[in-house]
A protein has these predicted regions:
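Eukaryotic short linear interaction motifs
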Residues: 10, 25-27, 74-75
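Surface loops and adjacent helix of pleckstrin homology
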Residues: 6, 16, 70
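Predominantly extracellular/luminal cell-surface or secreted proteins
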Residues: 4, 19-21, 140, 217
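Solvent-exposed beta-edge/loop recognition patches
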Residues: 38-229
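"Short basic amphipathic alpha-helical interaction patches in structured regions
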Residues: 2, 15-17, 81-84
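Short, hydrophobic/aromatic beta-strand segments
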Residues: 9-20, 78
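Short aromatic-acidic-glycine turn motif
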Residues: 19-35
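Asparagine-centered strand-capping/turn motif at beta-strand->loop junctions
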Residues: 1-8
Length: 230
């Protein structure tokens, strides 16, 4: 994942959250959320946070940083020489403390939430969905508290599954800095699950395990400086 500073100011990554939203795969059969939530939340399956004390990880205007699932050179013989990915220059990674995917030199993202708990769970590696995932980055305003592990008001189950004990983090829309939604392919254009106020459209690469990704389109501002289009 590549995060850009699309502003004219130095921004700090410290304390910014990253979440993949549910459903992890695009579907027209959407979850049912509490009626009282209205349109005020996005719902996170797993949540991470950038480390730092507030000013440790600056991002200058026009700069970007990379967060890798596994910040190694995936083309090494011990992994997959046919892989298109060399993640060894990544600044951050989602380290799951799995000896099969040992901790790399990149800074570790801090794990915040999964299935209602702070623990990472038993899944061996954090993976990006190849079937069209949806993601947000967000920041909790100064003076506000957001704790989906210990605050019952900040997590919920999918009410279409009455006996479910799988919890999702309620992410206030007002906290969200940016969102991206992908689907499997163009046949899933009617399967949007991210609120339009966060991402009005959807996109896709059209195939699985094809070595392709998605990116914002480049443009320029009034002074001719390069910017990333929303």
């Amino acid at each position: 994942y590549e995060i850009y500073n699309n502003s004219a100011d130095i921004l700090y990554l410290d304390g910014i959250y990253f979440a993949n939203l549910t459903p992890g795969t695009a579907t027209t059969k959407l979850p049912i959320w509490p009626e009282a939530d209205g349109n005020n939340y996005a719902y996170g399956e797993r949540v991470w946070k950038f480390p730092g004390n507030g000013t440790e990880y600056p991002l200058a205007p026009g700069e970007s940083c990379i967060i890798s699932q596994f910040a190694a050179n995936h083309q090494l013989d011990i992994y997959n020489p046919q892989s298109p990915i060399d993640g060894s220059s990544s600044e951050f990674e989602f380290n799951m403390n799995n000896p099969n995917f040992p901790d790399q030199a990149a800074y570790d993202m801090q794990h915040v939430f999964y299935q209602g708990k702070a623990e990472m769970g038993s899944i061996p590696q954090y993976l990006t969905s190849v079937f069209g995932g949806a993601y947000v980055i967000f920041r909790v305003p100064e003076g506000e508290a957001w704790d989906p592990v210990n605050d019952e008001n900040m997590k919920t189950t999918d009410l279409s599954k009455p006996n479910s004990n799988v919890y999702y983090a309620k992410i206030p829309i007002k906290y969200v800095l940016d969102a991206v939604e992908a689907v499997n392919n163009e046949s899933k254009m009617n399967a949007k699950r991210v609120p339009g106020v966060l991402d009005a459209g959807i996109t896709w690469v059209g195939a699985t395990y094809c070595g392709l990704g998605i990116a914002r389109k480049l443009s320029t501002d009034e002074e001719g400086n390069p910017i990333i289009r929303e």
